[in-house]
Amino acid sequence: MTDVTVKSLADEIQTPVDRLVQQFADAGIKKSEVDSVTQQEKETLLAHLNREHGSAPNKLTLQRKTRSTLNIPSTGGKSKSVQIEVRKKRTYVNTPEAEQAKAEEQAQREAEEQAQREAEAAAQKIAEEKAKRAAEEQAKREAAEKAKRQAAEKEKVTNQQTDEKTKPAQTDKARREAEAAELKRSVEEETRRKVEEDAKRVAEEARKMAAENEGKWPEPVAEQTESADYHVTTSQHARAAEDENDAKVEGDRRSRTRGGKATKQKKGNKLSESKADREEARAVGRKGKRKPSTLQQSFNKPVVAVNRDVVIGETVTVAELANKMAVKGSQVIKAMMKLGAMATINQVIDQETAQLVAEEMGHKVILRRENELEEALMSDRDTGAEAAAEHRAPVVTIMGHVDHGKTSLLDYIRSTKVASGEAGGITQHIGAYHVETENGMITFLDTPGHAAFTSMRARGAQATDIVVLVVAADDGVMPQTIEAIQHAKAANVPVVVAVNKIDKPAADPNRVKTELIQHGIISEDFGGDVPFIEVSAKVGTGIDDLLQAILLQAEVMELKAVRTGMASGVVIESFLDKGRGPVATVLVQQGTLNKGDIVLCGFEYGRVRAMRDELGRDITSAGPSIPVEILGLSSVPAAGDEVTVVRDEKKAREVALYRQGKFREVKLARQQKSKLENMFANMTEGEVSELNIVIKSDVQGSCEAICDSLEKLSTDEVKVRIVGSGVGGITETDATLAAASGAIILGFNVRADASARRVVETEGLDLRYYSVIYSLIDEVKQAMSGMLAPEYKQQIIGLAEVRDVFKSPKFGAIAGCMVTEGVIKRNNPIRVLRDNVVIYEGELESLRRFKDDVNEVRNGMECGIGVKNYNDVRTGDVIEVFEIIEIKRTIA
């Protein structure tokens, strides 16, 4: 037979090559994948595998099927035949432990049989020697008797001999008798000595065998047989048991058939025993002398709690936490309910909750960080730490109340007219610009002043070095001014106050200074450290002083940054451009951002395909404190995300996907839990009306601001639910979502495409466009007001005094009244007052004047009034007529 390689042999026997090479190595043959294998080496490997795994089958399955007919008596004295088929299947497993126990039992049995045979042989030998000695004694006795007879005969013949001859004969006889007794005594002693020696030898051998096999055999053989697994039986026992059981079933069937009735089983009948009892009795022994013992479970439940080290990630399900602690999921749910939180077995819980539950159940918690890949990616960055830090331009954020002139002030500095381009003349985006002055460069961030843009102002304060607080001299401190002060204090950045509109006649700078003192902004004139600059964005008054104050403050702060190395920064704003895709406005804080760099930005990543400055010009690099627009990200990032340049695009993608999954898990884990204390609040949720809205905006910041503002409009009766929101134009998907959820579509500075308009027309959806956030919020308020349940108010329209009471066969008591105030109308509800206390409330049944039915009676006229289902009208009562007015409610 030709030799084959290891790889071809592995393909032939369908096993991995590595496993086959390892098996050759275990057999003592060193082979590689391309080496050839001879027939002898194959046989050597096969012999090794047989020794390793064994070639005998370890499992034997017996299947039997018996059919029988059972006659069952029924009503009417007839019997009904029922066909019975009994199918039996038993599997006997020959495990290595069973084989070892069987071999040990066989060895012990053979040793006992050998000892018994040796004892029997010794006893037989002793018996043979004893019989031989008895035969010898018998022969001696017979010889003595024969000699005695011969002597007697000789005595008779020689009776006449002399006494001299007789005396020696008697002496010989006595001597022979003494010799015979001595021989008998010696034979008995020899026999007894040999028997004692044989007994000692057998006992000594038994002791040696017991000492050698101590630890190998169980103590008593009978107990080993009892405690052995009754499944480990020989095939002969199995067949015998099957035959015996079949014979019992067949005999029972025949007895039923002969008697026509099922005979009652006796109390001691073996058929009443369970199958396990019968097999246990068969495993104990076939002789039946020993009573079957009850099987005892060898495993005892531990009574001491086991404390484990539980490793918990940032999120974990209840089932996973239970598996880590080796307990049932129901126990974890009970522990969470004791802590005041309800959860299902598949619910995701956060790390803090899981830690509390595990520690409550007595386990040690090990918190695991899952962002090793992200840390490794961030550590493999060339940050230029060895380079010297250089001075950089300050980042200045313009903040203040709406319409106080922030953008106009910045426009005058930049000598542009951006404010006219903003819808409604208010800023709705963060604008980032850098300006070259005579004393250096300054980067400005213009934030919205409207109340809806709180989060955008907070982001601007966090990314800035200096805050310029713009306050109108004729308007003073307003709510958004106070909020801007709070953002500046939270970000711990210095403030420069610009008192704008100083050219107006109603300007009062001292009033502004006084009002700001209440909020911790103290002017230098009043002994504080905050510079106040009076400016006019319209005529340019004080602009140079403002820039000088900003640069002076920056010089005091000693702002520095490293220009070399990989860049890092923050996203100021982001939006989706129809032609360019996702666009992000990034403020570079460290390093230099170059075209072609791989960036990781929050949940998104990508390569910088293009860079543009605030004027729309293409640039190739941007240093610290320079705002740029970058293209090439995978999607629109969230405003405020950190931008980092990394080396590997593949790892950047993995980190971005990991962040997305982590954010989703954390969001699910931290959703509103069904806690015990708000169960009743959840029961009343069905009574609340919902206004579903789909919002699409041009930039991420505006979308976020609109969503926050609309959610704040929710009341106890009407709830605003944002079904979907995003950046970019209104697409067919958005229209389909609105149709499915019954929502209205609001577009802020965006429009719907043709397919979306087609869906809107087909489904009859409400689509509205806005360019100013004021209008959007006001119209949503109106829509919510229409969903509010109206209020009802009772208004008194007339009073009538009862002057006399008449009886009518048709209406009962009729009150003759004088209208003292207002108008009495026929179809309105009434109240009957007695001593200014309401005693009845109902409606008019009849209103007449001079026997004529009328619809109303005015002040100063008499009339007859019949009250429906009420006859206890008395003189002096007052009848009050009122009407119910519906009042529409509005949301403030």
Curated annotation (Swiss-Prot):
Keywords: Cytoplasm, GTP-binding, Initiation factor, Nucleotide-binding, Protein biosynthesis. Residues 391-560 form the tr-type G domain. It holds the Pfam family EF-G_D2. Residues 99-217, 239-254, 270-283 have a biased composition (Basic and acidic residues). It is found in: Cytoplasm. One of its GO terms (molecular function) is GTPase activity. Residues 446-449 are annotated as: G3. Residues 400-407 are annotated as: G1. Its main location: cytoplasm. Transmembrane segments: none annotated. GTP binds at residues 400-407, 446-450, 500-503. Residues 500-503 are annotated as: G4. Residues 68-82, 224-237 have a biased composition (Polar residues). Residues 536-538 are annotated as: G5. One of its GO terms (cellular component) is cytosol. Residues 51-296 are annotated as: Disordered. Residues 255-269 have a biased composition (Basic residues). Residues 425-429 are annotated as: G2. Belongs to the TRAFAC class translation factor GTPase superfamily. Classic translation factor GTPase family. IF-2 subfamily. One of the essential components for the initiation of protein synthesis. Protects formylmethionyl-tRNA from spontaneous hydrolysis and promotes its binding to the 30S ribosomal subunits. Also involved in the hydrolysis of GTP during the formation of the 70S ribosomal complex. This is Translation initiation factor IF-2.
